[in-house]
Amino acid sequence: HLGSGEEAGVERLAQSLQICLEKTADLGVKIALENTCAQGTCLGGPFWHIGKVLQKLQNPRLVVCFDSCHAHAAGHDLGENLEGVLSDFDAQIGLENLAVIHFNDGKGALGKHLDRHEHIGEGQLGKAALRGLLNHPKTRDLPFILETPEVETQIAKNIAAVRELRAV
């Protein structure tokens, strides 16, 4: 949406998704919209971008994927304000639309728009923020997908870290 503004970008995204939904109507597949780091002209950092698309299209095949690193990078403080972040998400998007969580730590500082995933508990989000998200009554029963670096060699380490966070 370069040069057109956020509203125009959201409108164009909704139009494109409507075409995708129409062309795949017989397949019954769902499309998950994922929050972004709000890098440059990318849509999806502010929750209202996704909320506006869902509101415009009103299609049950559209769901939302919440990425913990992306939220942190976009400035949503999961450590100090998880309740506020979830409340804002609910107001802008609706928690009923949340289908899955990409679970990862992040290398960048809060609000720096850096899309660099990190091993669980080793990044700038930290264990307390991740523990809060993993165990929160509004999110704990959702599917969590690990999206950490070096999956081939580090998956066991990250699974162990998640188990430790879940046990507390």
Where are these regions (language model features)?
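Active-site-proximal loop/turn and secondary-structure-junction residues that shape catalytic pockets
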Residues: 1-4, 35-39, 68-70, 105-107, ...
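A structural motif corresponding to the C-terminal end of an alpha-helix
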Residues: 20-31, 57-60, 92-96, 129-142, ...
